[in-house]
């Protein structure tokens, strides 16, 4: 993954595991905010808080926690860009490979701590960036030999037009969060939740009409004269037509009108990546954010990025038996230890092997040979080298192919 990022011209950065809590909250929606791991302040801050029966955990957390573990890599990246804007060459292409934390219930494909690999371009509104990220995604999964990858694509501007036709109130963020749960809770429950946030029942047929759309061009008739909706269609159409001419290796790009991505900061193209062979949810996802840096004081800086969930990708590779058989082999060669003189003789040979990029090690103590050989077997070492008194005298080695 790292080599593919660098092949596309992305440079690495890292950000702290902890962020000020106000940096993170309000960027992921109400549900996302609940999953942020808060860090208790040092000292007895609780004694200074006014606690009574009306005190809620939310109001109390303001007094006792002003730091949190990062929820994703995108929001800290936006802060990084603002803090370093005078030293950055725009458009700025960065990749970042670090852990993130979610206060979630652990289950298959869901983790409280997991590894994300992000690639973003910021400081450019060009849709060619979206096209490049789709190519990057295809190359990464091709390099990993993961077949039958689906890249689902939609545009937040189209979703904005949908909710404008269904409701006169500004409930877009709530609408996106509800629509994002369609696959999990089903269409009827989605409709029930939309009614709860103010959508009239006689407007729900508009949702049905949109969800029946399979082709981008068919959207135009439904959107009528919606300026923002038609702009979203034009952006989608541009990306899909360019991608169709590129002949992707392992991936297929599909338009999915129900794709919403529940994070508040997306404003344009959104995409989600799944394995057609393994039902584990998304293994990558991302989108366009036009004003994320503005919350930190830097306006009119658009960005787009994609995030790869490495832990889920590992699960897919494991289910499909894609890991090489020697993936957990740390040493190719093990020198057995017959005593101080023999071990000292091995050191120069070890140095030569390592200088030639051959992973090798010396067993540290002169334990029984059976114990040393068991060590080699458990570590799946390919070759064992035995140098005793006779081998030192003759200048020859005894090598066992394991």
Regions found by a protein language model. Give the residues of each.
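Polyanion/phosphate-binding surface patch
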Residues: 18-67
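Short, conserved phosphate-binding/catalytic loop or strand-edge motifs used
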Residues: 111-117, 153-161
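Hydrophobic mid-domain F-helix/FG-region of cytochrome P450s
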Residues: 136-143, 157-166
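A short beta-strand-loop structural module common to alpha/beta enzyme folds
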Residues: 11-17
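Positively charged, Gly/Ser-enriched RNA/tRNA-binding surfaces
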Residues: 1-8, 19-22, 55-64, 72-88, ...
């Amino acid at each position: 993954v790292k080599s593919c990022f660098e092949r596309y011209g992305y440079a690495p950065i890292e950000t702290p595991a902890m962020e000020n809590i106000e940096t993170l909250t309000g960027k992921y929606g109400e549900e996302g905010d609940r999953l942020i791991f808060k860090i208790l302040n040092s000292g007895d801050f609780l004694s200074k808080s006014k606690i009574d029966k009306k005190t809620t955990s939310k109001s109390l957390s303001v007094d006792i926690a002003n730091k949190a573990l990062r929820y994703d890599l995108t929001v800290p990246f936006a802060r990084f860009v603002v803090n370093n804007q005078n030293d950055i060459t725009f458009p700025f292409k960065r990749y970042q490979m670090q852990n993130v934390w979610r206060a979630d219930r652990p289950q298959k494909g869901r983790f409280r701590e997991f590894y994300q690999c992000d690639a973003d371009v910021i400081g450019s509104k060009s849709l060619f960036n979206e096209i490049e990220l789709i190519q990057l995604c295809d190359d990464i999964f091709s390099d990993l030999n993961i077949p039958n990858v689906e890249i689902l694509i939609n545009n937040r501007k189209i979703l904005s037009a949908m909710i404008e036709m269904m409701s006169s109130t500004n409930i877009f963020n709530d609408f996106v969060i509800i629509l994002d749960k369609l696959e999990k809770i089903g269409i009827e429950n989605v409709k029930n939740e939309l009614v709860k946030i103010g959508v009239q029942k006689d407007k729900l047929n508009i949702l049905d009409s949109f969800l029946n759309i399979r082709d981008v061009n068919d959207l135009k008739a439904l959107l009528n004269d919606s300026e923002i909706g038609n702009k979203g269609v034009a952006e989608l159409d541009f990306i899909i037509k360019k991608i169709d001419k590129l002949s992707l290796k392992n991936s297929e790009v599909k338009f999915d009108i129900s794709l919403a991505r529940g994070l508040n900061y997306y404003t344009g193209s959104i995409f989600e990546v799944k394995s057609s062979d393994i039902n584990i949810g998304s293994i990558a996802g991302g989108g366009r954010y036009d004003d994320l840096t503005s919350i930190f004081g830097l306006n009119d800086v658009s960005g787009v990025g994609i995030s790869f969930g490495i832990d889920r990708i590992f699960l897919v590779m494991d289910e499909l038996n894609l890991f090489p058989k020697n993936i957990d082999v740390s040493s190719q060669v093990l020198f057995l230890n017959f005593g101080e003189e023999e071990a000292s003789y091995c050191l120069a040979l070890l140095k030569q092997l390592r200088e030639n990029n051959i992973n090798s090690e010396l067993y540290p103590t002169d334990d029984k040979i059976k114990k040393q050989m068991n060590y080699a077997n458990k570590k799946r070492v390919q070759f064992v080298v035995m140098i005793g008194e006779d081998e030192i005298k003759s200048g020859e080695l005894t090598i066992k192919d394991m």
